[in-house]
Amino acid sequence: MNKLRSSAITQGVQRSPNRSMLRAVGFNDEDFNKPIIGVANGYSTITPCNIGLNKLALKAEESIRRSGGMPQKFGTITVSDGISMGTEGMKYSLVSREVIADSIETACNAQSMDAVLAIGGCDKNMPGAMIAIARMNIPSIFIYGGTIKPGKLHGEDLTVVSAFEAVGQLTSGKINEKRLIEVEKNCIPGAGSCGGMFTANTMSAVIEVLGLSLPHSSTMAAEDLEKELSAEKSAEILVSAIKKNIRPLDLMTKKAFENAISVIMAVGGSTNAVLHILAIANTAGIDINIDDFERIRQKVPVICDLKPSGKFVTVDLHNAGGIPQVMKILLNAGLIHGECKNIEGKTITEYLQNIPDKPPSNQNVIRGIDYPLYKKGHLAILKGNLAKEGSVAKISGVKNPVLTGPAKIFESEEDCLKAILNNEIIAGDVVVVRNEGPVGGPGMREMLSPTSAIVGQGLGEKVALITDGRFSGGSYGLVVGHIAPEAAVGGNIALIKEGDLITVDAVKQLIEVDLSDEELEKRKNNWVKPKPKYKRGILSKYSKIVSTSSLGAVTDL
């Protein structure tokens, strides 16, 4: 084992005061030669995603001690997207990714920790931890809190998205208030992150593919015993990684990120994966850009039938073989790089050796490569005069991903949702929600409430919604987000007027407004930059330093 980084605070006469502090929290003489391992715990009672993390932290802490390390627990924050959704509070969600990254980096580096074991559940916990891990490049592993089991109502599987869609169904007369309350009471049965292939489960899969969490761990249910056993094993593996000097940047290669993108396409993952993978890769110094997603999408099919647009939830994927089964299918098809390694030092080819070549015949969650749900990936990168830097369209479940229609323009998510619930949106409309980007929001809110209301009203196949904001992993339909440049910095989305014809064409990877360059230039000359919405606090700071979404909306370029 190499010289421990923590020797800076534990060794030598001059560090006697430092050691006295450590003795006060339980260190003995022999402990000063052990690796100090940070346990970054995102436990919170504010969300079911994180309410079960403490038991995992305790299991990991015990395992670290048994394996010869010294665990040092500290907390980091979380934001509950499900609670914040549709409110001003959602502006803090993406910001929390940076707060989580900064807090983990700060705690670990300030105390010269030798390694970190990060534990998280809700959406931004995963990319926040990965950004910190890439910055520090000390031996690291991530423990996902686990997915929630599906809610049940009259034999139907429910997720949190069922509740959002029920709002639209109620306002369009498809259900009554009694049914709405039944869905509300039954869609979230306990601890765990939202149950479909939404953002949390998508990003936990990304971490597993990158090799920084254990195989199969990203799809385990939060309340199952195997999740606790996995936490213990993760801690043991981390101590081994310290001895082997396996570091995150050894694993976070360009090929590893390409593997992650391939798997996200195959499972039908969240649009947020684009934003977060770009941010993590940027921190790791890896040249991954938005065009890489389109390149990989063209060759990787969607082979998993998962919610929000599909039939099954993440526990079903786990029971069908999980992410390793998906990876084995892609590996055999030459669609991922088998030489990439994981935290145990094993190559993908090695640790998938005992995974069957084909998915089990008694399930319908994972398909073979020769009979996919969709022949190409579902996350299309669209460009055009409305998104010169690019945008992200989620086209799974959309029969005809092409629409030209008049713009219905809204300057905020709230105004858009109000119009939808008042039945002001009709088939053929292109709904535009702008000034919701990283700078303009600020914070790039997710448009789950509007998209769910559109789907709930039966317009999911007939209306497009485009925005410089984001979408929840639970959104589906013809939706285009991450439009860059955003409205607040003078992107062309700021120049659209009510009724302008907009074309969204995911087949041709095109998003444009039917206006000449001359007309756009004329409007740009008359455009007035909006005043900042916040003058103090974290949203004010964030809006001044955040990058464009096409670079991952990072704050440390």
Curated annotation (Swiss-Prot):
InterPro entries: DHAD_IlvD/Edd, Dihydro-acid_dehy_C, DihydroxyA_deHydtase, DiOHA_6PGluconate_deHydtase_CS, ILV_EDD_C, ILV_EDD_N, IlvD/EDD_N. It catalyses: (2R)-2,3-dihydroxy-3-methylbutanoate = 3-methyl-2-oxobutanoate + H2O; (2R,3R)-2,3-dihydroxy-3-methylpentanoate = (S)-3-methyl-2-oxopentanoate + H2O. Binds 1 [2Fe-2S] cluster per subunit. This cluster acts as a Lewis acid cofactor. One of its GO terms (biological process) is L-valine biosynthetic process. Its EC number is 4.2.1.9. Mg(2+) binds at residues 81, 123-124, 446. Pathway: Amino-acid biosynthesis; L-isoleucine biosynthesis; L-isoleucine from 2-oxobutanoate: step 3/4; Amino-acid biosynthesis; L-valine biosynthesis; L-valine from pyruvate: step 3/4. One of its GO terms (molecular function) is magnesium ion binding. Keywords: 2Fe-2S, Amino-acid biosynthesis, Branched-chain amino acid biosynthesis, Iron, Iron-sulfur, Lyase, Magnesium, Metal-binding. The active site is at 472 (proton acceptor). [2Fe-2S] cluster binds at residues 49, 122, 194. The modification N6-carboxylysine is found at residue 124. It is an enzyme of class 4 (lyase). Its cofactor is [2Fe-2S] cluster; Mg(2+). Homodimer. Functions in the biosynthesis of branched-chain amino acids. Catalyzes the dehydration of (2R,3R)-2,3-dihydroxy-3-methylpentanoate (2,3-dihydroxy-3-methylvalerate) into 2-oxo-3-methylpentanoate (2-oxo-3-methylvalerate) and of (2R)-2,3-dihydroxy-3-methylbutanoate (2,3-dihydroxyisovalerate) into 2-oxo-3-methylbutanoate (2-oxoisovalerate), the penultimate precursor to L-isoleucine and L-valine, respectively. Belongs to the IlvD/Edd family. This is Dihydroxy-acid dehydratase.
